[in-house]
UniProtKB/Swiss-Prot annotation:
The lineage of its organism: Bacteria, Bacillati, Bacillota, Clostridia, Thermoanaerobacterales. The keyword Acetylation does not apply. This is Adenylate kinase. Zn(2+) binds at C130, C133, C150, C153. ATP binds at G10, A11, G12, K13, G14, T15, R127, T136, Y137, K199. It comes from Thermoanaerobacter pseudethanolicus (strain ATCC 33223 / 39E) (Clostridium thermohydrosulfuricum).
């Protein structure tokens, strides 16, 4: 099973990615993770990416593409993979298509988790994190026993700068501008399946399993 997972910040992609990878026994390939791995291992591609990142520049598509393609060449991807965070634009999608075509591999499904904008904002701005032990909370769905105090270590909880309203609105705008053309691209290729992410985690996962089961037939 070869799958791409799309969805805005706050859609629960990370949670679903772990479940999909386990259910279908395929590696979860997060571009953030493989970038960090290349930086840690000080690979040539990692060094190249770091040059751009140190200057505050976006890493060019050709570098990102190569980092992802190197990961897809590994043995654990022979029977499938789940791509999370890539492609981010149509140019990357076209390069991925070319790469897979050259390998004689086809993409089974592109899952697009959709969540109402208001719900996304509530999910993200409600997050609270313990700066001491890393525990995470949500002021509505999983609050601490005492307001703003970590249950585990007693430290004051914080709201990450990325989770503040202004930052969330900007992140959603960037995602929408980048992803709308991608959604159109995969719709034309008849590989896109929209998933209602407003449901519970388990309900969303059941819908994903059904979609992937139908595609795998």
């Amino acid at each position: 099973m070869r799958v791409i997972l799309l969805g805005p910040p706050g859609a629960g992609k990370g949670t679903q990615a772990v479940k999909i990878a386990k259910e279908f026994d395929i590696p979860h390939i997060s571009t953030g993770d493989i970038f960090r791995q290349n930086l840690r291992d000080n690979t040539d591609l990692g060094k190249l990416a770091k040059e751009y990142m140190d200057k505050g520049l976006l890493v060019p598509d050709e570098v990102t593409n190569k980092i992802v393609e190197d990961r897809l060449e590994k043995d654990d991807c022979q029977k499938g993979f789940l791509l999370d965070g890539y492609p981010r634009n149509v140019a990357q999608a076209e390069e991925l298509d070319r790469f897979l075509h050259d390998k004689g591999i086809h993409l089974d499904c592109v899952l697009n988790i959709e969540v109402d904008r208001e719900a996304l904002i509530e999910r993200i701005t409600g997050r609270r994190v313990c700066p001491n032990c890393g525990a995470t909370y949500h002021i509505k769905t999983s609050p601490p026993a005492v307001d703003n105090v970590c249950d585990k270590c007693g430290a004051q909880l914080i709201q990450r700068s990325d989770d503040k309203l202004e930052s969330v609105v900007k992140r959603l705008e960037v995602y929408e501008s980048q992803t709308k053309p991608l959604i159109e691209y995969y719709t034309k290729k008849n590989t896109l399946v929209n998933i209602d992410g407003n449901k519970s985690v388990e309900e969303v996962f059941e819908d994903i399993k059904k979609a992937l089961g139908d595609r795998g037939k």
